[in-house]
């Protein structure tokens, strides 16, 4: 048989093949495809008979993180994304559903925070646990009533005991990057016996390569090396600078053949 190209991805830098997703619909005439072709990781409907994009399903200055379920019977896609709410930390993961025609996108996890959810088989009920680096976890049982996600709180963490022992949450901060415009998001972890009148040595825990972002976005009462170093008398900083993931392809491409950059221009 004759080989025919159905979808082609190209880039003068690199293609993030590890983030690709495809789902061929029943009948074999259309396929849902994930791509960063417009700089942001989004979902497209591909016409397999013509070998062309039929329509862009998701769009905007934000990224699809993962496709959870394709409900062909109801023509709905369930997925996670970050950066949709411009007033929130762009790395926070939220859960969404959208019609295959690109209409009626609904947020299933409306509260601010980094979310992790577990759904029942037909996605009518789910347990959602969310938190931030500063805010303790809240667990909610949710269901969809029409187009709105309704929730009932099942559990909420109590920090009174660890706070009474001297524990303090890391400080979330933002600062403009090298372009003077794009906000960089990070955390500052101080010792539990921090004295604002004293000077402390600062250690930055750095990762500024492709493929991921490592600054904690969920609640971690003990954050490994970061907490240990802080308790030894250091102030520890973590920051996801240009070259890391989930802020668009141009943001990540800074690291292309340039790992020596390590995001330093965003830190100085």
What are these regions (language model features)?
Residues 30-34, 77-81, 126-129:
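Residue position within the beta-strands of beta-propeller blades
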Residues 42-44, 94-96, 138-140:
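A short loop-to-beta-strand structural motif that recurs across blades of beta-propeller domains
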Residues 26-28, 71-74, 121-122:
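Residue-level detector of Asp-centered blade-edge/turn motifs that repeat once per structural unit
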Residues 81, 91-94, 215-218:
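Beta-propeller blade termini and top-face loops
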Residues 36-41, 86-91, 132-135:
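Short, solvent-exposed loop/turn segments at conserved positions within beta-propeller repeat blades
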Residues 114-268:
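Serine-hydrolase catalytic core recognition
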Residues 1-20, 46-73, 82-87, 98-115, ...:
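Multi-bladed beta-propeller domains
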Residues 18-29, 33:
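Signature of short aromatic-glycine-proline-rich micro-motifs recurring in repeat-based ectodomains
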């Amino acid at each position: 048989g004759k080989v025919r190209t159905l979808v082609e991805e190209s880039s003068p830098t690199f293609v993030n093949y590890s983030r690709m997703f495809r789902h061929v619909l029943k009948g074999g005439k259309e396929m849902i495809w994930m791509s960063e072709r417009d700089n942001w990781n989004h979902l497209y409907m591909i016409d397999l008979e013509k070998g062309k994009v039929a329509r862009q399903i998701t769009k905007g200055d934000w990224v699809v993180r993962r496709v959870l379920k394709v409900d062909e019977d109801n023509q709905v896609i369930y997925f996670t994304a970050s950066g949709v709410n411009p007033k929130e930390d762009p790395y926070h993961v939220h859960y969404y559903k959208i019609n295959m025609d690109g209409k009626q996108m609904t947020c299933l996890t409306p509260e601010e925070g980094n979310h992790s959810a577990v759904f029942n088989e037909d996605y009518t009920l789910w347990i959602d646990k969310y938190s931030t680096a500063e805010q303790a976890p809240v667990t909610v049982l949710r269901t969809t009533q029409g187009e709105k996600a309704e929730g009932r709180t099942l559990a909420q963490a109590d920090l009174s005991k660890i706070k009474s022992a001297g524990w303090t949450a890391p400080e979330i901060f933002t600062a403009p990057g090298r372009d003077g415009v794009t906000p960089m998001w990070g955390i500052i972890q101080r010792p539990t016996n921090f004295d604002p009148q004293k000077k402390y040595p600062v250690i930055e825990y750095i990762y500024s390569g492709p493929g991921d972002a490592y600054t904690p976005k969920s609640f971690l009462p003990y954050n490994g090396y970061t907490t240990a170093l802080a308790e030894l008398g250091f102030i520890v900083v973590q920051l996801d600078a240009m070259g890391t993931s989930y802020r668009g392809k141009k943001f990540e491409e800074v690291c292309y053949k340039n790992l020596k950059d390590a995001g330093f221009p965003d830190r100085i």
